[in-house]
Amino acid sequence: MTVDTIFAPATARGRAGVAIVRLSGPRAATALTLLAGRLPEARRATRAALRSPPSGPGPTGPGPEEGGEVLDDALVLWFPAPASFTGEDVAELHIHGGRAVLAAVLGALGDLPGLRPAEAGEFSRRAFLNGRLDLTAAEALADLVDAETQAQRRQALRQADGALVRLYEGWRKTGIGLLAHLEAVLDFPDEDLPPEVETAVRGGIGALADALAGHLDDRHRGERLRDGLQVAVVGAPNVGKSSLVNRLARREAAIVSDIAGTTRDIVEVALDLGGYPLVVADTAGLRETSDGIEAEGVRRARARLAAADLTLAVSDGTVENGADDPAADLTGEAVLRVVTKRDLLDPRAVERWLARGALPVSTLTGEGLDALEAALESRARAFFEGDGTPALTRQRHRSALMEARAALRRAAEAPLAELVAEDLRLALRAIGRITGRVTVDDVLDVIFRDFCIGK
C-alpha cells in the first residue's frame, strides 16, 4: 500500500517567535533534502537556509547554490524510521513564526510530488498504527495539549506515561490466563484435570469483575478533571448569585440588575482553583412564575442543580429566617451554603451565619471571598483525589469497561463452561478496545478527529 508523506504545522498558527512544521512518510528525506540542500545528521539540530525547490532537481537533489528563493534561515531535524514519533521517516523544520514565512514553507512543501497536508490527528494515528502509541497514550497527548490547569496536566502526563494501559493490560492478561485454563478443561476432557480448575477460574472471573466495578465506581472523577467540576450557583431571585459569579470569575460574566428574574439562562465561567478546573454556572432564581421565558430558566436551573457535582446555595445574608428561601432546603456534603451582603451585616450576624455553617461574603467589597475560594478548592481536591489508581478519563473507556464487567458477571454465573469461555472472550475483547488491541476504523475516526492538525 502506498503511504503518502504528510506535513503540517505542529505549533499554533499566528505570529510567534518560532513555528515548527512536521513531515512524516517515505518522501520526508527527499523533501528535507530539496528544501535544506542536504540531509542532516539524524537527531541533531542543524542550521540550514530553506529554499523553494527548483523545478527540475538532479538525481541527488540540489545543493544550496542550486535551489530557488530563500524562504527562511531555519533549524532542521531528521528522525529516520523507526525511531520517530510516528515510526516513519520524520523531518521537522523549525522556522521563524511569522505568517508569511509559514505560508511560504507550507506552499513549497505542497508543490512537491507525493506530499499532502495532514488531516487532523493523522500523525498520532500513524504513531498508533505503527505501534508507537496505544490509544490511551494518544488520547492523553490530546488531553495534554488541551490542559489548562496543573491537575489536568498531571493526569494527562500520567496517562501518557502508560498508567492506564498498564492497568488495563494487567486485567487483560489475567483474563487470558483464566481463559487458557478454562479452554484446557474444554479441549482436553479426557485428561482427567482436577475439578478445582473450573472452580478457580470462576473465582478469578468474579475477582476480575469486582476490580472493574471498583474502577468504575469513581464519581466520573477523571472525566470531570478533563472537563471541569460542575458547580451550580442556585438560590432565590435577586440574592446576589450573578454578582457572586462575577466576583469568582474576576470579570463581568453575568448581567447584574436589581430587577428579580434578570438571569434566565445558564451562564458558565471556568475557574482554576489550586490547579483544579471548575465550571461555575449562574442560574435563574428559583421561584414560581407565570412568565414563560423565566419559567424555562427556572426549569434549566433545577436541571443544572440535579446534575451538579457541587452546589453553592446562595441566600441574602440580611434575611436570617427566610421562610421561602429555596437555598435553605439544600443540604448535604455536596452543598456549600453562601450568604451575601456581608458588608451590611454586623459582626454578631456574621458569627451567627458562620455557626450555621454558612460562608458570608460581600460581592461589593470582596470580603469573605478568599474563604469561599478556599472551601471550593478543598471540595475540588477531595473530589479529585482518588486511591492512587489511574482515573478513567473518557466515556469510551467507561462504556467498554461496563461492557466487560457485564460479560464477566455473566461468565461467573454461566451454567456451562462453554458459556463461561464465550463471555470471558467478550470481556477481553471489550478491554482490548480501550488500548487498541482490538479496534475498528470507526473507533479510530472518532478518537483522532478532534486532534490538532499537526498532532
Swiss-Prot record:
Residues 43-67 are annotated as: Disordered. GO terms for molecular function: GTP binding; GTPase activity; metal ion binding. The lineage of its organism: Bacteria, Pseudomonadati, Pseudomonadota, Alphaproteobacteria, Rhodospirillales. Its cofactor is K(+). This is tRNA modification GTPase MnmE. Mg(2+) binds at S242, T263. One of its GO terms (biological process) is tRNA methylation. PANTHER family: TRNA MODIFICATION GTPASE GTPBP3, TRNA MODIFICATION GTPASE GTPBP3, MITOCHONDRIAL. The keyword GTP-binding applies.
